[in-house]
Design a protein with these regions (language model features):
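C-terminal segment of N-terminal export signals and the immediately downstream linker at the start
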Residues: 23-54
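N-terminal secretory signal peptides and thylakoid transit peptides that target proteins
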Residues: 1-17
């Protein structure tokens, strides 16, 4: 069995202690300003399709997962929505959901009903990413 010097043992111990003290956080992928598909009439808002498949939820044929990337100052006008679940991945947005305003911050989740309306605006100084799971009839 090889002998380990006191100096090596202390160095290894300090390295392990330092590594365990650093918190590791998962971070959502931020997108560049030109990634994805530009949304017509909504300057600074881009759509990135992530996945789509059939659903087993009755009344719906498809579920679609996408990210909406809002550059600072970008606005999505209040418009009719289909059923969906929204999750704030990065940044912060001012949301109007059926006329009720609120601030969506990182990790917030909310829903939209069929026939309801929603608008969003990025009033912060950094890009924001909203992940959307759309339920399509």
């Amino acid at each position: 069995m090889p002998r380990v010097s006191r100096r090596t043992a202390i160095a290894v111990g300090l390295t392990v202690a330092a590594a365990s003290a650093v918190p590791i956080q998962a971070k959502a992928a931020m997108y560049g300003p030109d990634e994805g598909e530009a949304m017509e009439g909504m300057e600074g808002v881009r759509r990135i399709a992530l996945s789509e498949r059939e659903t087993k939820i009755s009344g719906f044929k498809t579920v679609r997962l996408l990210d909406l990337v809002f550059q600072p100052g970008a606005k999505f006008p209040e418009s009719p929505m289909e059923p969906m679940i929204c999750h704030m991945m990065e940044g912060e947005l001012q949301i109007a959901n059926n006329g009720d305003p609120f601030t969506a911050k990182k990790n917030d989740v909310w829903t939209c009903n069929a026939g309801g309306t929603e608008g969003a605006e990025n009033t912060a100084g950094e890009p924001a990413v909203m992940r959307v799971a759309q339920l399509i009839a």
